[in-house]
Amino acid sequence: ISVITSAIEHEAILDNLAQLKRRGFTVDILKPGTHGVIEPGTLDAAMGDDVALVSIMFANNETGAVQPVGELAQIAHSHGSYFHTDAIQGYLHAPIDVSVLRVDALSLAGHKVGASVASGALFLRRGVPFEPLIRGGGQEAGRRAGTQDVRSALGLAAVARTLYPRLDEDHARVLSLSGCLYERLLESPRIHATLPDLVHTDRLPGIASILVDGCESEELILQLDVRGFCVSAGSACSSGSTDASHVLTAMGIPRERAAGSLRISFDDRVREQDLNAFADALLDLTGGARS
């Protein structure tokens, strides 16, 4: 039995698939193009009769690149396979419609949208087989045993009711602001967009991913922290790791360049003056704008 995923997935996917591989499954890992996207043709070429599941994220948590999930799911279905997408980074930050994407399973979490870190949800299309990891009392329709965290579930529902009606408005506003941030940062000859083709489109609006020449991410993070700004070198879930980002290296970015990566993330509460203040600080640290 085979499972197909991508090299840019979160460790929550990759580590669990590594465990399946140790138990005898075949796991094929697809590489993205230099623009950070898994091409439909790449998946189609990898499909076979023994592929039970394809799992490709909706949008990358480091670069913000949105994947062509609808097309990828269609390819998986044409070969008789199920399709799952990790939509945790994109939920309530970009339009997501399971009736359009036609995925069989979609996972999301509350901590990315201001809800409890204990909250999350799973969309499972009717008829898709499911075996629970935690067995016991049969809660949640037998899908996850244990007393339900009602408070966290209600919190996630409240956040969804608040943010969903204004999703399109917030998406457009934050995308415009982050585009302006990129323009400010790229004034420096030492700062480059990780995905220059996606600066103004096809990405999550609240993530800016850059590469800084001649700088170590760790030093920049410390210097920015002193100035009141919190950024990361890659996934926020990998804080403390000194390894180059597996996402960036999978895209073909050399390790020495990936060592100078920064991930700047923000939500719909961000103000233009906040981003300008950050840009001023980083430009000062990297020697200023082009003359």
Predicted regions and their residues:
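Pyridoxal 5′-phosphate
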Residues: 1-291
